[in-house]
Amino acid sequence: LLIGTRLVPQTSKYSDTGLNNYQSLGSNSDVQIAMTSRKYNPEKDFMVVQFNVKSDSGAAIDLQKIKFKLAMINVQPVKYTVIPLTNNQIVVTIRGIKSGYQAIQLKAINKAPNASALDQGDTTDVLNTNSSSSSSSSSDDETGSTNSVKFIINENKDFESTKLQLLNQKDYTIKALQKQINTLRKNRKHQQKLIAAYQAQIEADKQSIENNNADAKYKVSDSSSSTGNSNAQSDISTQRDNIKTSRKNIKKIDQQIELYQQQIRDVQSGKYKFQSGSTTSRLK
């Protein structure tokens, strides 16, 4: 009677980390990270967890400096791979994770230099047998690193999907690059529409000047015509500057699209080097 059935996942004592909840990756860093998605395929025994990283200052973020460690309540010989993508996104794939794992912890660690954490270790995990309950933290308690954030994922049917597909590093990277290219192309079209609007405004200003000059022939003295022409000329100058800015934006967009396309070609040819995968049987 039990064939083909699955037990209801046992709830752990640890609280789930919420989605899109950004937390600091360092006391002296403005880098923040959030888990944005987690899906599990119980038939094919794999999980896909997505993260997004951002900087309050807008500074560039080296995703290669962000490492992950995996811990489990019910330890299984799983393999996990960290895949940095474009647009500050990271995908972590966990293979060989079977139903009954109860809860896992993914700890993101910022390996970028941080003076306040140089002398601190990185020794504790939420899922240690004697640890207290916690959902996530921007520090590792009193003895750990202040450059890490812990994400707890409890076993839950709500985010299970047998339709979930596991892509390899190449596929995830190419998919993300193509998405970025599509976004850039939309932005390019927007810039072209702006240019058309700026040009239309210039033509309207020129027509206004022409009309003012024609009307001035029949007036003894009219300062309003002179003022109107001055305003129109000023607006023409502004619109021309706007056109230059949009054309510069288009040039940058075209350059970035070409770089992404080159990266896709390098990924397809094998020239692009990925991070090596990680294997774990037990993490404390």
Locations of regions flagged by a protein language model:
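C-terminal amphipathic alpha-helix
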Residues: 242-284
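Aromatic sugar-binding surface patches on proteins
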Residues: 84-91, 225-228, 232-237
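Short, charge/polar-rich alpha-helical segments
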Residues: 162-200, 246-247
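N-terminal, leucine/charged-rich tether regions that mediate assembly and partner docking
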Residues: 1-95
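Extended assembly-interface/linker segments at domain junctions
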Residues: 70-176
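Extended alpha-helical coiled-coil "stalk/arm" regions
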Residues: 191-233
